[in-house]
UniProtKB/Swiss-Prot annotation:
Protein name listed in UniProt: Crassicorin-II
Native source organism of the sequence: Urticina crassicornis
Cellular localization per UniProt: Secreted; Nematocyst
Recorded GO MF terms: ion channel inhibitor activity; toxin activity
Similarity comment: family membership: Belongs to the sea anemone type 3 (BDS) potassium channel toxin family.
Record key words, sorted: Antibiotic, Antimicrobial, Cleavage on pair of basic residues, Disulfide bond, Immunity, Innate immunity, Ion channel impairing toxin, Nematocyst, Neurotoxin, Secreted, Toxin
Higher taxonomy: Eukaryota, Metazoa, Cnidaria, Anthozoa, Hexacorallia
GO terms for cellular component: extracellular region; nematocyst
Annotated GO biological process: defense response to bacterium; innate immune response
Function of the protein: Peptide with both antimicrobial and neurotoxin activities. Cationic AMP with antimicrobial activity against both Gram-positive bacteria (B.subtilis) and Gram-negative bacteria (E.coli and S.enterica). Shows no significant antimicrobial activity against bacteria S.aureus and P.aeruginosa, as well as the fungus C.albicans. In vivo, induces reversible paralytic activity towards the shrimp P.paucidens. May act by impairing sodium or potassium channels in the prey.
């Protein structure tokens, strides 16, 4: 299963903005895509 957490947007494998702080470039990091 996917393990998604919100982190500052830095990479390629980052998806979505749901449940992430707004206005700070946060995205979901899904480890399952690495």
């Amino acid at each position: 299963g996917a393990s998604c957490d919100c982190h500052p947007f830095k990479g390629t494998y980052w998806f979505g903005t749901s449940n992430c702080p707004s206005g700070h470039g946060y995205r979901k990091k899904c480890d399952s895509f690495f």
